[in-house]
């Protein structure tokens, strides 16, 4: 018999009754029922119940074991009586009557329990991640992560993509966040950077004559903490294709992404044909470029009902600013003063002066609008609003007014809040859509200049002629995002593969030819030697797994994540290094403010 086990802890069934077996694992819990000891023995695969009575030669050893000790047991498979069968366990019809026990390893008092999975402070969980990962939910999350990544690989390979690994020590380049820098010992005073994404490498692969690339790519960004991104390091399904237009990429990746969601949806429905929604439409209808389409609320421009109306606040806003609009946020079933007042309080908590509203009641076959706005704009305008929005008895509507560029984000948050408060959101589906036609440039108010809105390497719609003739702030890019349930899960674009157009694009944001050649020299050089039209995308693996597992925190689906302060509590990183290491790198630490005072 094997030194440690003949079977794993999820393998044995009723057909194995009478078999002599050997199992090894962790003591999940110990129970004493009238002098008979029951031990749940756990390994990676599952749990098997071990039984010892005082007549067992192993009884005295079993009496000593505690939670999370590692033991080896020899015994005989016995059938459980009908009244004690555990239908929730694959091994629930049997138990092992123990004959011999060996203690392989002991555990100190646990800083967090493995059995029962109560809520525990996250910092404790991260510091003792090796214990946290023993818990059933976390163990399943990580195994599901592995399965999803394997499914991604299979899907990509089945669609003619080849997996390449690109370098992790590369040059620093501005891609929207700070780089993690690695000092060079050989070339002192110079630094490598960990890649924020394999963007330039994957484009260079296309220029090297390869056709369809993918990679499960680690990405490193020194960003301030964000709730929807792991600090420091995350993984993406990175993709690039040669000789493609935008629709080619979408048509190729849509069935791949749909198949991943369908395989792991756990009974939830998945969008079959992903709608294409323009960026402008997404902002106007949903107040977000990553809308949650499970929420049926669609916002509408209702400005026409407020021009020269009795509601002077909105009427004055419209009169003073030609860009001003009034947007309506319909709230089916939200027609109570208590709910409307609650939303008003929420809006004030978001830093807004309030949230105007109307709610409708039907009195003797006639709809009546209630609330200050209805009172001020009059019966005729109130009814016209109700008809435009398709609202009925017991429904409500909230309003925001001003320049949409300034209030769209708040309006989107209000739409989300209304949908959640009224339980309008369909929790049993994954609702996916492509967001297309992103603006190429945006105005940087802090620096008073034009800046890239998204990816600087994308092709402008209209090409060189548009760059020459159009107001840059009106230019659209061949860029697209894939969104699901209110999250951006992938982003991509058709690349600019023409060197002169590349220079023109960067010139518009104030970067000279010299700067472009210094920062993107390899890409710029490659463009001069026959660059194919190409495009691709990158999907956030951690975020996709988070959605599929139904958790709210990315750290629940990552193996050894940092906390929100970018600290690795398990490995105590970042940490001090020795003066010898610094000297080898030619680095001297500047005195801190505390030391210099």
UniProtKB/Swiss-Prot annotation:
InterPro entries: Aa-tRNA-synt_II, aa-tRNA-synth_II, aa-tRNA-synth_II/BPL/LPL, Asp-tRNA-ligase_1, Asp-tRNA-ligase_1_N, Asp/Asn-tRNA-synth_IIb, AspRS_core, GAD-like_sf. It catalyses: tRNA(Asx) + L-aspartate + ATP = L-aspartyl-tRNA(Asx) + AMP + diphosphate. Gene3D superfamilies: Bira Bifunctional Protein, Domain 2 (3.30.930.10), GAD-like domain (3.30.1360.30), Nucleic acid-binding proteins (2.40.50.140). Its EC number is 6.1.1.23. L-aspartate binds at residues 175, 221, 454, 495. Keywords: Aminoacyl-tRNA synthetase, ATP-binding, Cytoplasm, Ligase, Nucleotide-binding, Protein biosynthesis. One of its GO terms (molecular function) is aspartate-tRNA(Asn) ligase activity. The record marks 33 as: Important for tRNA non-discrimination. GO terms for cellular component: cytoplasm. It is found in: Cytoplasm. It is an enzyme of class 6 (ligase). ATP binds at residues 221-223, 488, 540-543. It comes from the Bacteria. Residues 199-202 are annotated as: Aspartate. One of its GO terms (biological process) is aspartyl-tRNA aminoacylation. Homodimer. Belongs to the class-II aminoacyl-tRNA synthetase family. Type 1 subfamily. NCBIfam families: aspS_bact, PRK00476.1. Aspartyl-tRNA synthetase with relaxed tRNA specificity since it is able to aspartylate not only its cognate tRNA(Asp) but also tRNA(Asn). Reaction proceeds in two steps: L-aspartate is first activated by ATP to form Asp-AMP and then transferred to the acceptor end of tRNA(Asp/Asn). This is Aspartate--tRNA(Asp/Asn) ligase.
């Amino acid at each position: 018999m094997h030194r440690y086990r003949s079977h794993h802890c999820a393998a044995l069934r009723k057909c194995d009754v009478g078999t002599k077996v050997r199992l090894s694992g962790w003591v999940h819990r110990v129970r004493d029922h009238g002098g008979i000891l029951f031990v749940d023995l756990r390994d990676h695969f599952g749990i098997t119940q071990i039984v010892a009575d005082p007549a067992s030669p192993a009884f005295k050893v079993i009496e000593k074991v505690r939670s999370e000790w590692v033991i080896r047991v020899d015994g005989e498979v016995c059938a459980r009586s009908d009244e004690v069968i555990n239908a929730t366990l694959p091994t629930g019809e049997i138990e092992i009557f123990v004959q011999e026990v060996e203690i392989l390893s002991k555990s100190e008092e646990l800083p967090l329990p493995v059995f029962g999975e109560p809520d525990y402070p996250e910092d404790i969980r991260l510091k003792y991640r090796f214990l946290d990962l023993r818990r059933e939910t976390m163990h399943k999350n990580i195994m599901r992560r592995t399965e999803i990544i394997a499914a991604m690989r299979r899907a990509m390979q089945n669609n003619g993509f080849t997996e390449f690994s690109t370098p992790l020590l590369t040059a620093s380049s501005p891609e929207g966040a700070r780089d993690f820098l690695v000092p060079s010992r050989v070339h002192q005073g110079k630094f490598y950077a960990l890649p924020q994404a394999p963007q330039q490498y994957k484009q260079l692969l296309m220029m090297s004559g390869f056709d369809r690339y993918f990679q499960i790519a680690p990405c490193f960004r020194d960003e301030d903490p964000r709730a929807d991104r792991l600090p420091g390091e995350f993984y993406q399904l990175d993709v690039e294709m040669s000789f493609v237009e935008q629709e080619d990429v979408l048509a190729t990746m849509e069935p791949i992404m749909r198949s991943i969601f369908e395989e792991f949806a756990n009974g939830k429905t998945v969008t079959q044909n992903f709608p294409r929604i323009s960026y402008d439409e997404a902002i106007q209808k949903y107040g977000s470029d990553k809308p949650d389409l499970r929420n049926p609320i669609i916002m509408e421009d209702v400005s026409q009902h407020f021009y020269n109306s009795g509601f002077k606040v909105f009427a004055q806003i419209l009169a003073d600013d030609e860009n001003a609009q009034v947007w309506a946020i319909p709230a089916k079933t939200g027609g109570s003063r208590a709910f409307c007042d609650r939303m008003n309080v929420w809006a004030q908590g978001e830093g807004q002066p309030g949230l105007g509203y109307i709610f409708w009641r039907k009195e003797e076959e006639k709809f009546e609008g209630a609330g200050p706005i209805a009172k001020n704009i009059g019966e005729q305008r109130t009814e016209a609003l109700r008809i435009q929005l398709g609202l009925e008895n017991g429904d409500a509507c909230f309003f925001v007014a001003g320049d949409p560029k300034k209030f769209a984000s708040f309006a989107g948050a209000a739409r989300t809040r209304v949908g959640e408060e009224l339980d309008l959101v369909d929790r049993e589906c994954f609702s996916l859509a492509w967001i297309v036609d992103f603006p190429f440039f945006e105005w940087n108010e802090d620096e008073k200049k034009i800046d890239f809105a998204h990816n600087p390497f994308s092709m402008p719609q209209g090409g060189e002629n548009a760059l020459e003739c159009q107001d840059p702030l009106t230019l659209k890019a061949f860029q697209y995002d894939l969104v699901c349930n209110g999250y951006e899960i992938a982003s991509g674009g058709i690349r600019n593969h023409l060197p002169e157009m590349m220079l023109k694009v960067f010139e518009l944001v104030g970067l000279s030819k010299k700067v472009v050649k210094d920062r993107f020299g390899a890409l710029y050089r490659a463009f001069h030697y026959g660059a194919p039209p190409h495009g691709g995308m990158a999907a956030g693996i951690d975020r996709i797994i988070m959605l599929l597992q139904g958790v709210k925190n990315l750290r629940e689906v990552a193996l050894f994540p940092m906390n929100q302060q970018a600290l690795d509590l398990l490995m105590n990183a970042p940490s001090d290094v020795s003066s010898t290491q610094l000297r080898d790198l030619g680095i001297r630490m500047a005195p801190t403010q505390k030391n210099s005072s």
